[in-house]
Structure formats: C-alpha cells, structure tokens
Amino acid sequence: MEGLAGYVYKAASEGRVLTLAALLLNRSESDIKYLLGYVSQHGGQRSTPLIIAARNGHTKVVRLLLEHYRVQTQQTGTVRFDGFVIDGATALWCAAGAGHFEVVKLLVSHGANVNHTTVTNSTPLRAACFDGRLDIVKYLVENNANISIANKYDNTCLMIAAYKGHTDVVRYLLEQHADPNAKAHCGATALHFAAEAGHLEIVRELVKWKAAMMVNGHGMTPLKVAAESCKADVVELLLAHAGCNRRSRIEALELLGASFANDRENYDIMKTYHYLYLAMLERYRDSENIIEKEVLPPIEAYGNRTECRTPQELESIRQDRDALHMEGLIVRERILGSDNIDVSHPIIYRGAVYADNMEFEQCIKLWLHALHLRQKGNRNTHKDLLRFAQVFSQMIHLNEPVKAKDIESVLRCSVLEIEQGMSRIKATQDDDIHTAVDNYECNIFTFLYLVCISTKTQCSEEDQSRINKQIYNLIHLDPRTRDGSTLLHHAVNSSTPVDDFHTNDVCSFPNALVTKLLLDCGADVNAVDNEGNSPLHLIVQYHRPISDFLTLHSIIISLVEAGAHTDMTNKQKKTPLDKSTTGVSEILLKTQMKLSLKCLAARAVRIYNISYQNQIPRTLEEFVKFH
C-alpha cells in the first residue's frame, strides 16, 4: 500500500488527474482515506496529495480531491518556499503563497480555514502578502481573513508587504485599517521595514496614513534606518514630512553621508562629502544657536583622527578619500553607538579593501576594533576570527611580517569566544544546537590555525610567553569537538579540516610544531576521544609516512617524551601499535616503547580479567582501565 501511496502522490504532484482517478478507482473507503492522508517525504518536504497539488497549482486535481473524495482541507505538512522551511502549512497556505488564485478559491469554497496558522503563526494571508498577490489578498480578506494576525515574531502582514515592496498590497491593507504603528518583537514598524528596503512609494503611503517615527529595539527610527542603509531618497522624503527637530535632521544627514563612505553596494564618496557638508551647514545655520558636535575620543583603528567639527575642517579633507573613509567610520560609531549591530560591517569592509591593497597593518587595526565591538555586544565572531587566520596566512605566504602581538590579541579573543560558545551550547534549544556546535567547532579549528601561524612568526621571548599563556588558557578549558577530540588530537590528525582561503597555504595537519607547542603549554598527552583514542592512536595512522617522515617522527617522539602511554587501549582494546597502518609508524613506535613495570602489571590485570575495582587506590583504577 505504501508503494501505491507513492504513485498517488506523484500523480497529484504532477497534475495528472486521470491517472490519479484510475489509481483510486474501486478502492475501499479505508484505502482511499489512507492513500489521500499518506504523508510523503521528498527533498525535506512532507506533504499529502492535496497539499502538493495545491502547492503546484493543479486545480483539477484539487477539485477531484475536494469534491469527489471529500479530503480534509486542514491537513498540514512541511513545505519549502523561497528558501524557507514552513512547518504546519495547509493546502490553502501553499496555494496562497505560490499565487494559485483558482486553487485558493476552490479551497475556501470547500471550507478551508482562512486564518489557520503554521507553526510560526503564519496565515495564508501573510503568504499572499509575501508574494504580493493583491487579488488573493483581497479575496482572503473578503472571506474573513484577519489582517491583524502576526507571526511568532509579531511581524504583521503589513510589515512583510512593506518590506517586500508590494505597494498595492500595502495600500489595500491600510484601507482595511491595518495598524501602521504595530511593532514586531525587534521593535520595528512597517515604516522601518519599508525605509530599510528603500521602497519610497510605500514610505510615502505609510506617512500619509500617519505612520509614526518610532524607535526600534536598537534605538533606530525609520529615518535612521534609511540613512544607515544609504536610502537617500527615503531620508529626504522623511526629512520633509516627519517634522523632525534640528538634531535629528543633522544626525540623519551625517549618518547618510557616513554610510556612503564604507558601503560595498552603495559606495559614493561624493555623496559622503555632500551629506556631511549639508549636516555641517545645518549645525551652523543659526549663528546664535550653533549645535556643537560631541566627538568620540580618538580611536587607534581610525588613525587616532578627531572628527571634523567645523565646515572649514570638513572642507580641508574634501579631496582626501582616506580621511573621508575614516570620518565615515567615526561618525557612524558616534551616532549608532559602539554596541549597535550594524556598526562593525563597514569597518570590516574598509579593512578588506586595505587588505586587497596590501595595506595589512591598517586592515588588522580595523578588524581588531570590529572584533572587540562584536565581542562586547556578545555577537557570534567565528567568521571574524577565521578572517584573521586567513589574512595572517596571506601575509606569511607573501613574506609580509605578522606581529606577534596581533596574533596574541586574536588568540585571546578566540579563547573568550570558545568559552562563550561552550555556554551557548548548554543554553541553546534543540532547534539551534547544530548551528551553535558548528560555530564552536569552527572557532576551535581557527584557534589551531592561529597557533600554527604563530610558529611561523618571529617572536621575542616576551611575545612567545604571551601567546603561550593564551594557549594554556584554552587547554585549561578543555574544549572538545563532537567526536570528543581535544586540541592535541586535531593537531596530530590528518583529517583536521583546513580553511581553503589562504589558510591552507600556511597551515596543515598533522603538525609537529603545533603538537610540541600544545604539549609545552600543558596539553594532556593521554586524553582520549569518544572512541578511547589518544593522540598517539591517531598519529600512527598517518597515511604519508615516507613523504612526510619528519612530521611523523617528530610527533611520535614529542608525544612519547611527554608521557604518552604506548600500551594504552581504546574502546576496541587496541593499542597505538595495533592501530599502526604502516610499517614506518610501527617501527618508530617500537623504538620509542619503554614499558614500565607499572604498565606491564596493568596490562596483565586487563588481559587476564583480574578483578581490581575497590581493591586498589582509585587513582590506580583509572590507570588500569585505559590499559
């Protein structure tokens, strides 16, 4: 029956109404109920014949299922739309979201619930608003769809239509008394979403319907959001209509100009100067009431520059692009605040431009500043940390000097991020745990790249001591990847992933220098992963014993000299010697094996299954256990 259900689903999916009717012909009522209620799984989607037929716009199939077989319209499934996975979607939601008006009408006429919500509280009306189908939106509203139902983030139908740029839908919803000042969880209104996306006509429409200049959860008004997003026409419209005071006007013009200076998509240095100058004129418009700037203290990353305070100072840097770039970054940080989520992106962009021009020192200063801002705001920084490993690797590959103090700074931030990552994993819900673990593991690997880079950098004794302190700090936290591997396991493992953007020009594993450095900083040489393997178990399986003999030799010697037990068994009762995959590693291991009487005795106890628990000191029990 399951095989037949697959054929039924396929026929419904492809709109083959005659085939579907033939498959169901002369079937018992219970069989038909089973076949038409069967949930098929394809490409991450889970749906019934009715849902997939509605999703694909097969009107005749939907009519057959509803009128002849009385299929329940409230069946739910999991579907993909525009890259999003929608759980709990009905056939009506799918038809509305995919723009199949005839199917929508069929379903509604057969009693489909127009206000049924998905797991995230999305309605069919919201799906139609997302797609911009005014005809479907009108039909649903005329059939009692509630325009005020928001999704689980309190994001309304008006907000999604405003963000997606569907002017006619926005106008209709406002005419139906949708609240233009409703707030989402993040504090944003429809005006915020339209302003950020630069939809001028929608902004004009919302203002006409008395949308207020409200502040969102990040302290941003729609005017500020438009300025930060380089939407000059929206800024000028809001300045003309919003009745904002002089300070707000100045701030918006400054933020707009500053944003044009360091935006990858909207870079325009002429507009930077133009809007900064307009803001400066506004400050000095009334000689009796000049609005002075409250400037930030000088920041090293910005070349210790002080922001221009007079029209003359601004005029003096008009032809100096670099100065205008820095002016833009300073202005943004002053207006938005250092804890604003959007402050760091242009800093990173400007740093990347410096790196592309081989101006690595300035790049690193900016990226370190951005990293500190993001960590201060408790943001995920795995991409930022990896970016440093990439640029340091690029520098080494090009024989450019890398400063040990910069490596140490990034290592320190990595330790903090990995520690926070451990806490995030403990506090994370099951749905997001995969992403949290991915980011955490990425940071562990980045830390190893940075350690590897440090071994290829000129360091004074003091610098090396500082680097070692950060390595010690992380070893002390004992971070593990999914398979229970420690830093030392990954340092000796050829399967350790290496980022392929510059990093793999400099870093590779197994790595003898990284292994030695980790051991010098206190790494546990006999730590085991989830399978009971010690680092020694892993290195003896290295598949390049001849071409990379020195690495294999150095690591085995380092591990044994640090106290690695050559007779230690994993969960399969295999010693490193048993796990050796080549004659070379076997010979190297045998030449290093100096079994103590204590080890021989422990092995004998294990081999002959002699009872030892609660008969010897507890510290010895652990020792016997891993032999």
UniProtKB/Swiss-Prot annotation:
Superkingdom of origin: Eukaryota
Keywords: ANK repeat, Apoptosis, Cytoplasm, Nucleus, Repeat, TPR repeat, Ubl conjugation pathway
Annotated pathway: Protein modification; protein ubiquitination
Function: Substrate-recognition component of a Cul2-RING (CRL2) E3 ubiquitin-protein ligase complex of the DesCEND (destruction via C-end degrons) pathway, which recognizes a C-degron located at the extreme C terminus of target proteins, leading to their ubiquitination and degradation. The C-degron recognized by the DesCEND pathway is usually a motif of less than ten residues and can be present in full-length proteins, truncated proteins or proteolytically cleaved forms.
One BP term from GO: protein ubiquitination
PROSITE patterns: ANK_REP_REGION, ANK_REPEAT
Secretion signal, residue range per the UniProt entry: none
Residue ranges the record marks as coiled coil: none
Protein name: Protein fem-1 homolog B
Gene: FEM1B
Species this chain originates from: Gallus gallus
Oligomeric form and interacting partners: Component of a CRL2 E3 ubiquitin-protein ligase complex, also named ECS (Elongin BC-CUL2/5-SOCS-box protein) complex.
